[in-house]
C-alpha cells in the first residue's frame, strides 16, 4: 500500500510538472524575445537541485536560453583538495544545457571567495602560478567546445578601483590576470574569456573608472580578455557603495565597452526592491549598447534567491511571474 501510494504520488507530481511545462512554454519566452531584438541570450543560473525542482525547471526550460552554474564550477566545488577534482554538480548542468540546446557560461575560474585553504595558503610565486595554470587548464579543457564563455577572474577590484588584496594579487601582483587568461586561451582558443565584477553600475564611480582604466591597459598589452561581465544589482547597498539607480546602467555598459573588449554582458542580475521600470531600464541598457550581448538573471524565484528577503527576481516565492516579467516582454 505504501509502495502504491508512492507511485500514485510520483505520477501526480510528474503530471503536474508536465502541465506546468506546457503552460510555461505556451507563454512568450524572455530569451526568444531578447534574441529577436538582436541579442545573444537571456539567461539564468542553474544547479542540479534547481533543475530537479518541478516548479523551477520548466521556467528555465521555457524562458532562459543560457545557463550559469551558481556554485558548482567554483574552486571549492571543483578542486577542494589539490588534484582532487569533483565535477558531478557541474557535469549535471552542462549535460542538461547541451540536451536542451542552451548556451553555457562558466563561472568562475579565479575568485578570492569560496577558495580552498590549500590555495589561499600558498606563498611561493612559482607554486601559485603552477596551481593556477593547472586548475584553469583542467576546467576549461573538460568542457572545451561546450561552454560559450568563462568568467576567468571574478571580483578582483576594490571599491577605490585598485586591485583587491587576495592570495593571487599578494603573491603574484597583477600578473595573475595574464597567467589565468593565457592558460584559459590555450585550453580553449574558441571560448570567450571574461573578467567579471560588481559595483560597476555607475560610470562615474571610482571602482568603475579604475576597472575601465586597468582592463583597457591589459587588453592593449595583449592579455586575451574578450569580454566584461558586470553584476548589476543597482539597488543593493554594498558595504562600500550606497547603491546605484538603474538609470545609469547604459552609461556603465558603454564605459565597460570602451576598454576595447569585444563584448560586454550583464552576467549577474538581481535587483532588490526593484520596480518594473528598473528591470526595463536594465534590459533597454543592454539593447542600446551594441557590444552588450546578453543578460543573466541570478535566480528564477525569490524563494531560492540568496537575497530572498529583498524580492530581487522576476518570479515570486510561488514561481509566478511578477509584473516586471510582463513589462520586459512588452518592452521587447
Swiss-Prot record:
Its main location: secreted. Residues 1-19 form the signal peptide. GO terms for molecular function: endo-1,4-beta-xylanase activity. Residues 45-331 form the GH10 domain. Disulfide bonds join 286-292. It catalyses: Endohydrolysis of (1->4)-beta-D-xylosidic linkages in xylans. Gene3D superfamilies: Glycosidases (3.20.20.80). It is an enzyme of class 3 (hydrolase). Pathway: Glycan degradation; xylan degradation. Pfam families: Glyco_hydro_10. Its EC number is 3.2.1.8. Endo-1,4-beta-xylanase involved in the hydrolysis of xylan, a major structural heterogeneous polysaccharide found in plant biomass representing the second most abundant polysaccharide in the biosphere, after cellulose. The keyword Transport does not apply. Keywords: Carbohydrate metabolism, Disulfide bond, Glycosidase, Hydrolase, Polysaccharide degradation, Secreted, Signal, Xylan degradation. GO terms for biological process: xylan catabolic process. It is found in: Secreted. Belongs to the glycosyl hydrolase 10 (cellulase F) family. This is Probable endo-1,4-beta-xylanase F1. SUPFAM superfamilies: (Trans)glycosidases. The active site is at 155 (proton donor), 268 (nucleophile). SMART domains: Glyco_10 (SM00633). It comes from Aspergillus flavus (strain ATCC 200026 / FGSC A1120 / IAM 13836 / NRRL 3357 / JCM 12722 / SRRC 167). One of its GO terms (cellular component) is extracellular region.
Amino acid at each position: 500500500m505504501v509502495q502504491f501510494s508512492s507511485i500514485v504520488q510520483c505520477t501526480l507530481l510528474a503530471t503536474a510538472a508536465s502541465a506546468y511545462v506546457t503552460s510555461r512554454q505556451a507563454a512568450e519566452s524572455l530569451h526568444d524575445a531578447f534574441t529577436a531584438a538582436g541579442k545573444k541570450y537571456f539567461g539564468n543560473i542553474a544547479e542540479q537541485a534547481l533543475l530537479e525542482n518541478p516548479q523551477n525547471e520548466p521556467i528555465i526550460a521555457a524562458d532562459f536560453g543560457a545557463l550559469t552554474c551558481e556554485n558548482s564550477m567554483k574552486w571549492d566545488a571543483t578542486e577542494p583538495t589539490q588534484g582532487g577534482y569533483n565535477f558531478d554538480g557541474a557535469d549535471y548542468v552542462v549535460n542538461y544545457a547541451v540536451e536542451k540546446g542552451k548556451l553555457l557560461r562558466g563561472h568562475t575560474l579565479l575568485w578570492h571567495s569560496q577558495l580552498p585553504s590549500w590555495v589561499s595558503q600558498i606563498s611561493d610565486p612559482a607554486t601559485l602560478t603552477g596551481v593556477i595554470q593547472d586548475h584553469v587548464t583542467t576546467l576549461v579543457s573538460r568542457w572545451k567546445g561546450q561552454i560559450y564563455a568563462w568568467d576567468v577572474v571574478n571580483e578582483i577590484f576594490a571599491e577605490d578601483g585598485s586591485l583587491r588584496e587576495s592570495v593571487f594579487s599578494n603573491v603574484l601582483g597583477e600578473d595573475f590576470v595574464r597567467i589565468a587568461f593565457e592558460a584559459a586561451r590555450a585550453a580553449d582558443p574558441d571560448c570567450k574569456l571574461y573578467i567579471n565584477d560588481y559595483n560597476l553600475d555607475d560610470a562615474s564611480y571610482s571602482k568603475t573608472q579604475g576597472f575601465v582604466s586597468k582592463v583597457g591597459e591589459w587588453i592593449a598589452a595583449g592579455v586575451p580578455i574578450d569580454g566584461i561581465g558586470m553584476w548589476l544589482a543597482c539597488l543593493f547597498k554594498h558595504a562600500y557603495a550606497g547603491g546605484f539607480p538603474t538609470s545609469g546602467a547604459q552609461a556603465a555598459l558603454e564605459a565597460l565597452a570602451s576598454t576595447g573588449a569585444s563584448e560586454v554582458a550583464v552576467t549577474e542580475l538581481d535587483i532588490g526592491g526593484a520596480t518594473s521600470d528598473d528591470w526595463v531600464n536594465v534590459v533597454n541598457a543592454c539593447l542600446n549598447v551594441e557590444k552588450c550581448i546578453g543578460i543573466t538573471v541570478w535566480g528564477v524565484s525569490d524563494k531560492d534567491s540568496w537575497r530572498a528577503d529583498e524580492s530581487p527576481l522576476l518570479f515570486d516565492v510561488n514561481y509566478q511571474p511578477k509584473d516586471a516579467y510582463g513589462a520586459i516582454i512588452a518592452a521587447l
